[in-house]
Amino acid sequence: MTKKIALLLLPFILISCNGLGPKRVKNIVELTPKLAIQTHEPIYLDSNANIYAFNANMLKNKQYSFARSKTITEPVFIGDMIYALDIRSNISAFSIEKNKIIWSYNLSRHKKDNYIGGGILHHNGKLYVTYGSRLLVVLDAKSGYEIIRKELPDIIRIKPIVLNDNTVLVQTISNQTIALNAETLKTVWEHESLAEVLSASYFMTPIVQYDNVIVTYNSGQILALNITNGEVKWNFEFTNLNDRTAIPNFDESSILCTPVHDNMNLYIATGLGKLIKLNVATGSVIWQVNAEDIQSMSLIGNSLFVTNNARQIAAFNPETGKVKFVADLNDGQDPKKLKSAAFLVPFVGVNNNNKRSLNVISVNGVLYSFDVDNNGLNMIPHVVKIIKNIRYYGLSANNNLYFSTDSKIIFGSK
């Protein structure tokens, strides 16, 4: 009898022992290594990139419904029209002036299916559309009439791009890059790398740089391909980075967010916990620094701004890779109580008094604005509650600032 009682009490005895029993699990904000200031250098927000006439009250303007269902890609603005692609593979043309959908066309023959990824390219009066299937569909932009479609070897999760007036480019999830004639969709050239079993969580839209197009593969490669014939000019592999080895099929071999570039350099955040600067002419590494779980990046003035899963915004010196500014995006809360948040690309806003601020939008519905004064960029932001689920922002065809969720759009001047 005594033995039976002892056995029944054993689990409770073990739980009460030091080191056993329930423990609080750290959240991703706590687990992400924080960036720290390494050098004290001035920050100038004086470039033309990512600077907009902006104030927080814009986000209270009227919201317009511009698509049939929830959108899955960034809207495209051409004149008065907004072209949007939704989760049901409907592409819609929305007139800003008339405040209504002018035409809508379903790209799939399986209307009940949900699709992920893809995008819209407007080129020479046509829309080249991918929607997370194997198909590239070309429509007349004015009428929505289907002109031609082509089935590719595998699913396409990124938008097509223009290589030149006669050629468009698509890339599949199985590491196939295919240049197509813009009229006939016949293959001009193609390049293929080793296909991986699992796909990366983020797919980078190829970047045209002079005579080359820069592409990435989920095997951990970045390549510069000649836009005329697809020849490889240079090839960089994440396995060349120090300290850790990229593992195919996992996030370590992936790119975490949209890279940024200037005329000579490409800045990339990798799943290896590295932020790297590449020379676009040669593919050589100029510098690499430790920076975990970067969400978004922006080149503004003399700084490379990044946000990360630790809910920080930081400024790197683009020349050296050293951190010169760090601030928290935490609403003043205890980090242990913070939930993860997704942050859009930082941008600079200029208000009616011509004063500038650095702004970060959280998809959770929070705007963080850092003022600039005589002492530089403030480390404590103004925190403003805004509408949730803003996914994109930018300039419309008439240079009007817009913000879009997965179903609504807001214009800055409306």
From Swiss-Prot:
InterPro entries: PQQ_b-propeller_rpt, PQQ_rpt_dom, Quinoprotein_ADH-like_sf, WD40/YVTN_repeat-like_dom_sf. This is Uncharacterized protein RC0314. The lineage of its organism: Bacteria, Pseudomonadati, Pseudomonadota, Alphaproteobacteria, Rickettsiales.
